Amino acid sequence: HLIVDEGGELCACGRRGCLELSLAAPHLRARLRAGGSGERAAIRADAGHSLGIALAPIISALNLNDVVLCGPPELLDGPLLDAARDTIRIRTLSAVSNGLDMRMAKGGEDLRLLGAAVLVLSAELGVS
């Protein structure tokens, strides 16, 4: 649970501006439904900005070259992904952000199941 906007909406945890409120699919879909058609790109871009705020220090600390997002492409691709990239570029050194490849995962819903299976295999059988 991470705060990305101190003046943001009240979260179920009692704090304001938590990343979940701007990025979790159910919350993002609700905001898109409530907004007009002209606001949808801005709502998605705002969520992408929040994602970039959360990811930038991690990308810098670990010097990551690749970030792969998994989730509903109709929500994550386009304005959200573009805004996340832009925010990361602003918040990291150019040596880090210039080499960064941030993209959508290919494989859809099965990736979540595969990730869970890998965690089980690793924890229970030592397979990595």
Predicted regions and their residues:
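Short, intrinsically disordered, charge-biased short linear motifs at domain edges
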Residues: 1-4
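ATP-binding/phosphotransfer module of carbohydrate and carboxylate kinases, centering on a glycine-rich
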Residues: 7-10, 15-128
